[in-house]
C-alpha cells in the first residue's frame, strides 16, 4: 500500500528559519530541507497524511505566524498539498547537496555515491527527521569553531553534545580527532538518527555515545568533567542550560554555543558572565552567531 504524504512549503523571513525547523520537528515532520529564495527562505517539510489532517496543518500554520508576530517579522506564507511515497523519498533530498565547511570538512548526503578522492574529511549524513544537515549557518559556525578548537592535540578531548540532532557535531568532532563524544537529545528520533549516522561514518559505538535526555543525563553517561561542550539549539533553551554547565566542566573546559540570533547576543552574554563563563570569540554568519567560550 502506497503511503501518501503532506508536503508543506513555508516561505519565510530568513531570521525565522531555525524557529520554524524546531516547530516542524516538534510537530512530527519526517524530512525537512530549506533553500534561499531571493530575500526569503523556502522550507519544505513532509508528514504522513494518515497522522495529520487539514485542521492539524492549519493549527501549525497559525503557530508559525504567531512566532513571526512575536519576533516582529513578516508572517510566513504556508501552503500544503499531497504527494505519494516515491515523490516524498526523493523530493526533500534533491534540495540538499554536498557542502564544504571550514578548511577540512565535506558534508556528504548518504544517498550520493561516495567520491573516489577528496582532500577533505568526508562526513556522510542522512538526517532523517532530526535537525542538522550542515546547510544551516549555525551548524556551519559550530563545525568551523570545532575545527579551530581541535587543531592541536584533539586526541585527548572528550566532548559533550547537547541537543545532538542528527549527530553532525559529534561526528565532526571525531573526524577532526576528538577522543570521544557523548550526545544527548530529548527527541528519540534524534537519538536514532545520530546512531545511524555514527554507523554510516564507521565510528565505533564506544567513541560516540548517544542517549535520550538533556544536560542532566550526561554525568550518568560519563562521570568525569568534559573538555568541551557543544550546543546548537534555540537561544531560550541555551539560557536555561548555562547555569548547569559548570557541573560538567573542568576549570579549562571550552564551549561552543549557537542557534543564537544576533539580537539575542546580550542575554546570552549576560547569562554566561553570571555563571562564570568568558567569551573567547564571537563569530557571525548572516543573522546568526556562535559563542566560543571558556571558564572564567
Swiss-Prot record:
It is found in: Cytoplasm. Keywords: Cytoplasm, Methyltransferase, S-adenosyl-L-methionine, Transferase. GO terms for molecular function: protein-lysine N-methyltransferase activity. Methylates ribosomal protein L11. GO terms for cellular component: cytoplasm. This is Ribosomal protein L11 methyltransferase. One of its GO terms (biological process) is methylation. It catalyses: L-lysyl-[protein] + 3 S-adenosyl-L-methionine = N(6),N(6),N(6)-trimethyl-L-lysyl-[protein] + 3 S-adenosyl-L-homocysteine + 3 H(+). SUPFAM superfamilies: S-adenosyl-L-methionine-dependent methyltransferases (SSF53335). It comes from Picosynechococcus sp. (strain ATCC 27264 / PCC 7002 / PR-6).
Amino acid at each position: 500500500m502506497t503511503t501518501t504524504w503532506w508536503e508543506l512549503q513555508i516561505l519565510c523571513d530568513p531570521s525565522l528559519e531555525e524557529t520554524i525547523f524546531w516547530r516542524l520537528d516538534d510537530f512530527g515532520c519526517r524530512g525537512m530541507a530549506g533553500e534561499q529564495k531571493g530575500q526569503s527562505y523556502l522550507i519544505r517539510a513532509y508528514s504522513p497524511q494518515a497522522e495529520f489532517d487539514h485542521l492539524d496543518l492549519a493549527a501549525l500554520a497559525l503557530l508559525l505566524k504567531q512566532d513571526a508576530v512575536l519576533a516582529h517579522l513578516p508572517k510566513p506564507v504556508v501552503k500544503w498539498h499531497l504527494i505519494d511515497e516515491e515523490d516524498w523519498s526523493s523530493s526533500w533530498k534533491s534540495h540538499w547537496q554536498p557542502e564544504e565547511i571550514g578548511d577540512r570538512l565535506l558534508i556528504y548526503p548518504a544517498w550520493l555515491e561516495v567520491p573516489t578522492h577528496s582532500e577533505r574529511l568526508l562526513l556522510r549524513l542522512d538526517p532523517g527527521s532530526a535537525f542538522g544537515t550542515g546547510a544551516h549557518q549555525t551548524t556551519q559556525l559550530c563545525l568551523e569553531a570545532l575545527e579551530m578548537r581541535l587543531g592541536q592535540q584533539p586526541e585527548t578531548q572528550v566532548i559533550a553534545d547537547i541537543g545532538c540532532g542528527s549527530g553532525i557535531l559529534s561526528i565532526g568532532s571525531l573526524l577532526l580527532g576528538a577522543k570521544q563524544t557523548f550526545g544527548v537529545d530529548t527527541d528519540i528520533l534524534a537519538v536514532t538518527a545520530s546512531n545511524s549516522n555514527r554507523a554510516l561514518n564507521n565510528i565505533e559505538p564506544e567513541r560516540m555515545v548517544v542517549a535520550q535526555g538533556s544536560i542532566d543525563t550526561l554525568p550518568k553517561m560519563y562521570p568525569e568533567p568534559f573538555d568541551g561542550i557543544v550546543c546548537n539549539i534555540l537561544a531560550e533553551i541555551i539560557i536555561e542550560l548555562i547555569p548547569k554547565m559548570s557541573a560538567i566542566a573542568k576549570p579549562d573546559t571550552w564551549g561552543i554555543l549557537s542557534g543564537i540570533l544576533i539580537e539575542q547576543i546580550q542575554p546570552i552574554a549576560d547569562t554566561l558572565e553570571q555563571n562564570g563563563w568568558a567569551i573567547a570569540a564571537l563569530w557571525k554568519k548572516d543573522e546568526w552567531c556562535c559563542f566560543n567560550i571558556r571558564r572564567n
